[in-house]
Amino acid sequence: MTIKPSRSRTPFKMVNFRFLEYSVEALKAIFEEATGTPGQNIARKNHLTYFEEYFRVLKAKTIIVETPYVDHDFLEDFSAYYVKCFRSYDRFCSRLHFLNIPLSSEFFDNILQSGSDSISVKELNDAYLGFVVVKPIPSTFIGRTCLKTYAPDGERSFPFTHEYEVSLAGLSLKVKSLAYQEQDSIVAACASTAIWTAFQATAFLFQHHVPTPVEITKAAVRYFPFSNRNFPNKGL
């Protein structure tokens, strides 16, 4: 399905949604298509192994692929580094939504148009497992990610999770999580990304601004003029 943008003086791309049956093979193919990373490299990523087990436990049934998606954090990365590269990089990401129920585009259209289907928006929200932003860069492409936690079993504790609001084709959904993303060795190494994740918790508790990973890196090196350039970044 395709969502047309509202009228504006600024040209926008059409937002498209693809509905796929979940499988780790489908997820791997999406990563390969969205990033241009060879399949064998994706297969070696620990993230794919992690997602496979995680979505098995959460009983994922459907992937909704939203393209193009504008991600604030990556847009900052893009303007700080990628737009200046000799190689041309896209500034638009993809966002993958996961559900624990089967869902087709036709069925979703009915929900949007009439809201009278057997599955309500509330039931859709109950089935929502969260999202993964896929950045259009090779290798370190896992962007802002908010996924539902494992069910409480007395052994795991998630004290700093909170609700994130998600707009899916205009439908307001929520997922209780703590956002994280893969470290980007170009603009934000492990320390910057770890601080960004910590800020996801403290911002909810103390109502402060969450700087992007590239802003964290810039702040860290502002008063320490290293001999090497800041980007690509080798760590704080």
Where do the model's predicted regions map?
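Active-site nucleophile-adjacent alpha helix/oxyanion-hole segment immediately C-terminal to the catalytic cysteine
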Residues: 3-6, 10, 14, 156-228
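Active-site-proximal segments of catalytic enzyme domains
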Residues: 228-236
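Cysteine protease-like catalytic core of ubiquitin/ubiquitin-like
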Residues: 124-173, 177
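A sequence-composition feature that detects small, non-aromatic residues
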Residues: 26-29, 34, 43, 60, ...
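Long, charge-dense tracts
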Residues: 1-146
